[in-house]
Amino acid sequence: MNKLIIALILLFFSLSQSIRGQEDNIKVSLMTCAPGTEIYALFGHTALRYEDTARGEDWVFNYGMFSFNTPRFIYRFVKGETDYELGVTRYPYFEGSYAMRGSSVYQQTLNLTISEKQKLRRLLEENYLPKNRVYRYNFFYDNCTTRARDIIEKCIEGKVVYSEGKERLSFRDIVHQYTKGHEWDELGIDMCLGSEADKPIDTRKQMFAPFYMLEAAKKATIVVGDSVRPLILHEKKVVDVEPEDVR
C-alpha cells in the first residue's frame, strides 16, 4: 500500500511538472508598434505574438494586412470601406521590418492560463482560415487593434476590466494627436469624419488607437469570481530605434 501511495505521489508531481513546463513554454504578447509616416501608419499598429519554445514556434498574427493599390484607398480607409485581412509571419521578420522602418515596438506579455493560451491559439487558427481571414475594416470600430483586443477577451475565462480614464477625448481629438505635422493627411481625414467624431468617448472606444490600447491593457485586470489578476505580466521595448517615447 505504501509503495502504491508513493507511486501515486510521484506520478502527481510528474504530471504537475509536465503541465507547469507546458505552460511555461507558451507566451502570448500584445505588440504595439510606433507610428510611421504613411497615412495608414500614422496611428501605429497592433499585433499578437505567439511563442511556443517547446515546438520552436514564434509567430506574429497581424490583422493589418491590406492592398494599398485599392482604388481611392485613403478615402475608403477612413470611411471604413476597405477590406483588411489577418496575416501570419515569423517574429524575426516582423521585428526586422519595424527596425528597418525606424519604428519602436513594445511587447506586453499577457497573464493567461494555459487553457486560455490554447483557446487563443485555436481562435487565431480559426480566424486564419481562408473563409474567415478577410474582414471589412472600420477606422474606429474594427481595426487591427480592436480585433486583437476582442480575441484576447474571447479566450479569457473571466472578464477583462479596464480602468476608465478621467479625460474624455473624442475620436477627432485622438486623430489630431497623431496627424500633427501631417496637415494634408489631417485635412483629408477630417473631411471624411462626421459630427459623431466630436463626441466624448469612453476608454473602450479610445482603444481604436494602438497606444491607447497599450495604456488601457497596462492598467487592466482579469476578474474570475473573487480572483483578480493583472492582464499584463510585464512590458518591454523589443525594438528601440527612437530617441524618445512616442506615447
Sequence positions of predicted segments:
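Soluble extramembrane regions of membrane proteins in the secretory/endomembrane system
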Residues: 22-243
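Bacterial Sec-dependent N-terminal signal peptides
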Residues: 1-23
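Non-catalytic terminal regions of proteins
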Residues: 245-247
